[in-house]
């Protein structure tokens, strides 16, 4: 299985690939990224009865609360948008982290990967 892991714009690209890809991905880990409603709209052909055809794909989103590049509120918005089309999203917020990745985020990502079947 292909697992996409991205930071900032890479996280955004990973989530977009998940939504529009014609093949199922193994998982997504996104650090300090964001998803917009337009991204969901671009996947309309993959959404049936309000649920994305690959909504069982595991997703972890990690974001720093002090992020000034991609606002921290993007974490909840991205999660809610993905939830709205059937995805179950795990999240981790990092209290004193700006736009970056810290050891706790890496550790959570590793634990997430180890939990995949």
Regions found by a protein language model. Name each.
Residues 46-56:
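Short, conserved loop/helix-junction motifs that constitute active-site signature segments
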Residues 54-59, 85-88:
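Short, proline-enriched alpha-helix->beta-strand connector loops that line the catalytic pocket
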Residues 11-22, 28:
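Short glycine-enriched nucleophile-adjacent loop
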Residues 76-117:
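C-terminal catalytic histidine-bearing segment of alpha/beta-hydrolase fold enzymes
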Residues 60-63, 67:
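Short beta-strand/loop motif that positions the catalytic acidic residue
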Residues 1-6:
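Alpha/beta-hydrolase fold nucleophile elbow
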Residues 28-37:
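Active-site nucleophile loop of the alpha/beta-hydrolase fold
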């Amino acid at each position: 299985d292909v697992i996409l892991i991205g930071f900032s714009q890479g996280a955004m690209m990973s989530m977009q690939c998940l939504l529009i890809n014609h093949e199922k991905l193994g998982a997504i880990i996104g650090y300090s990224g964001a998803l917009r409603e337009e991204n969901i709209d671009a996947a309309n052909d993959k959404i049936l009865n309000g649920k994305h055809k690959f909504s069982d794909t595991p997703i972890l989103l990690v974001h720093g609360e002090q992020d000034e590049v991609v606002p921290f509120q993007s974490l909840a918005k991205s999660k809610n948008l993905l939830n709205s089309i059937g995805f179950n999203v795990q999240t981790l917020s990092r209290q004193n982290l700006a736009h970056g990745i810290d050891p706790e985020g890496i550790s959570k990502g590793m634990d997430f990967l180890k939990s995949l079947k």
